[in-house]
């Protein structure tokens, strides 16, 4: 006997019913064929490749699972992509996430849409889609940040970041906006070291139509300052500064991590401004050297 049923080109199950059956026998025959065809379809679907399996340590904390650091000296190679995107010279899937990320730049809206399925930016190694520009000296980076999916994971992170290199365990300092509204300044003081938090604040609930949260990361020598604008006010310093020394050129840029190793999510960073002549974050608004909101058009000042 051949297959009791088969999948059509449209994906439906077709049952072959022979003619001349009595009503009762025909009903039994139909039922038998239905369940046999269902088993056939299930077996075919089971053979389709699924998502890669993430190790337990890469899973976020839940009521039934404690979040833990990666194994000692665990690393994955970063995947780099040549070619500029907007203001940035290149982009990378730092830490070789199990699923590839993506990024797009819309010149009309000045928006970078960054998607990634990535375990975290924490502990001794990172995974994220990173858009970068090699720079040196004093610099500031600012951007508006939004998450298109309001129901995404609370610890997803959109970051403004300075990294010494593109390895997953690079020395780095970042300011991050989490999906649940946490904002912090954090740094990895040495390669393969644990990240330390320098300061944090909570953005609170966002009413419909609220201005996007705007963050800034400012480098002056070895001193880094977190800048924030929560409700459309001028950027201003938040929390304490942090000290970190970089050797030679570094990678400055924006990135996103879903905090879920096989689930992709998205952040949008807009009105990105890079300034190589750093203004003083602690100057009074409107004073000489004060940090100001960018013009409508995205700019780079060299």
PLM segments and residue spans:
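Extracellular glycan-recognition regions
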Residues: 50-302
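Bacterial N-terminal signal peptides
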Residues: 33-45
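N-terminal start and proteolytic maturation junction detector
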Residues: 1, 5-6, 15, 56-59
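Serine residues within intrinsically disordered or low-complexity segments
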Residues: 9, 22-23, 42-43
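Short, positively charged and aromatic/hydrophobic N-terminal segments
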Residues: 15-16, 23
């Amino acid at each position: 006997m051949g297959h009791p049923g088969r999948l059509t080109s449209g994906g439906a199950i077709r049952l072959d019913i022979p003619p001349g059956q009595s009503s009762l026998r025909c009903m039994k025959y139909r039922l038998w064929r239905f369940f046999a065809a269902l088993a056939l379809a299930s077996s075919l679907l089971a053979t389709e490749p699924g998502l890669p399996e993430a190790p337990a340590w890469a899973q976020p904390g839940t009521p039934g699972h404690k979040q833990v650091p990666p194994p000692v000296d665990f690393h994955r190679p970063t995947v780099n992509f040549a070619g500029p995107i907007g203001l940035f010279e290149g982009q990378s899937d730092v830490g070789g996430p199990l699923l590839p990320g993506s990024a797009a730049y819309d010149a009309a809206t000045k928006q970078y849409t960054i998607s990634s399925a990535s375990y975290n930016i924490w502990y001794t190694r990172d995974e994220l889609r990173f858009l970068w520009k090699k720079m040196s000296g004093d610099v500031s980076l600012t951007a508006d940040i939004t998450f298109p999916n309001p129901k995404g994971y609370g610890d997803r992170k959109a970051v403004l970041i300075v990294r010494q290199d593109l390895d997953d365990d690079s020395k780095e300092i970042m300011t991050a906006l989490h999906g649940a509204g946490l904002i912090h300044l954090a740094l990895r003081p040495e390669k393969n070291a644990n990240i330390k938090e320098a300061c944090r604040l909570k953005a609170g609930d966002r009413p419909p139509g609220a201005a996007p949260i705007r963050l800034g990361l400012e480098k002056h020598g070895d001193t880094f300052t977190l800048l924030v604008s929560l409700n459309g006010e001028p950027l201003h310093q938040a929390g304490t500064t942090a000290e970190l020394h970089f050797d030679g050129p570094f990678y400055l840029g924006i990135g996103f991590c879903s905090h879920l190793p096989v689930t992709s999510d998205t952040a949008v960073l807009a009105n990105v401004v890079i300034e190589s002549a750093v203004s003083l974050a602690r100057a009074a608004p409107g004073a000489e050297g004060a940090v100001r909101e960018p013009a409508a058009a995205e700019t780079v000042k060299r």
